């Protein structure tokens, strides 16, 4: 696992955007062989999305031959609801880049058969050849996507009940009213994320420090699902200084030293 420690949120967002753009460009994608990107929502990736939009406007990266699969979606929210992840992705990213609408895949939380929707999502990922780079955020409790503590580390796309902590955390997007937050969601599994060729996790702020410490220094456990990244051959966490507050001094210095040429 690589841990990239940047000074602040803006710096880590730019690093992540540059990394994603470099991977797309190196793949030289075509309509027949597109680059497949896994996309998160939430506040963590917003800076990266803004930086990627700028790189796209500057002609430094194109999304014409990029196919995306989003991590998750609430169950029961209309697609055009202001807090649906469909709305989030188009408003904050897709509307501002040269991606083709037919290349965007987001789980349908209003499907008649939710289990079939999840199975078909996995099938679509497999048929295109898997995900080249899965980007993700991390919750204060170490969850990735909606894989809450206790989730199977080999799990695939499925329906999940959200924990009280997550409902409270997400209520900030629903007028701070926990009763407005959907109680279930469709989410890719930990195994789905780990099946990607590369995984890039964004971790920022002191409130994520404990999760980062478990991800890097702790054992692999279902109670901190991000810890499963230790098993991935090409896992990267890019974080800011505040997120490193719980790391041992030796761990911090090790990653600062080994990655100094890449910062």
UniProtKB/Swiss-Prot annotation:
Its EC number is 3.5.99.6. The lineage of its organism: Bacteria, Pseudomonadati, Bacteroidota, Bacteroidia, Bacteroidales. Allosterically activated by N-acetylglucosamine 6-phosphate (GlcNAc6P). It catalyses: alpha-D-glucosamine 6-phosphate + H2O = beta-D-fructose 6-phosphate + NH4(+). The keyword Zinc-finger does not apply. Catalyzes the reversible isomerization-deamination of glucosamine 6-phosphate (GlcN6P) to form fructose 6-phosphate (Fru6P) and ammonium ion. It comes from Phocaeicola vulgatus (strain ATCC 8482 / DSM 1447 / JCM 5826 / CCUG 4940 / NBRC 14291 / NCTC 11154) (Bacteroides vulgatus). GO terms for cellular component: cytoplasm. Gene3D superfamilies: 3.40.50.1360. Disulfide bonds: none annotated. Keywords: Allosteric enzyme, Carbohydrate metabolism, Hydrolase. Belongs to the glucosamine/galactosamine-6-phosphate isomerase family. NagB subfamily. This is Glucosamine-6-phosphate deaminase. The record marks 151, 158, 160-161, 254 as: Part of the allosteric site. The keyword Hydrolase applies. Pathway: Amino-sugar metabolism; N-acetylneuraminate degradation; D-fructose 6-phosphate from N-acetylneuraminate: step 5/5.
């Amino acid at each position: 696992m690589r841990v990239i420690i940047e000074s602040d949120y803006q710096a880590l967002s730019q690093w992540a955007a540059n990394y994603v753009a470099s991977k797309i460009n190196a793949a030289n994608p075509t309509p027949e062989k597109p680059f497949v990107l896994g996309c998160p929502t939430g506040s963590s990736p917003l800076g990266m999305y803004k930086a990627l939009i700028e790189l796209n406007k500057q002609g430094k990266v194109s999304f014409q031959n990029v196919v995306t699969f989003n991590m998750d979606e609430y169950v029961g929210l209309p697609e055009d609801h202001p807090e649906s992840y469909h709305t989030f992705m188009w408003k904050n990213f897709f509307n501002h880049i040269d991606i083709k609408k037919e290349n965007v895949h987001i789980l349908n939380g209003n499907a008649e058969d939710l289990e079939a929707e999840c199975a078909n999502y996995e099938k679509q990922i497999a048929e295109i050849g898997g995900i080249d780079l899965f980007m993700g955020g991390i919750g204060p409790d170490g969850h990735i996507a909606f894989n809450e503590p206790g989730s199977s580390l080999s799990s695939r796309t499925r329906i999940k009940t959200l924990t009280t902590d997550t409902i409270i955390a997400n209520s900030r997007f629903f007028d701070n009213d926990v009763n407005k937050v959907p109680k279930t969601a469709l989410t890719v599994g930990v195994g789905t994320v780990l099946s990607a060729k590369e995984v890039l996790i964004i971790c920022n702020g002191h409130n994520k420090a404990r999760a980062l410490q478990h991800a890097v220094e702790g054992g692999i456990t279902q109670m901190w699902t991000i810890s499963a990244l230790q098993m991935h051959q090409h896992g990267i966490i890019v974080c800011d200084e505040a997120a490193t507050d719980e790391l041992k001094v030796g761990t911090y210095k090790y990653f600062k030293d080994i990655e100094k040429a890449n910062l």
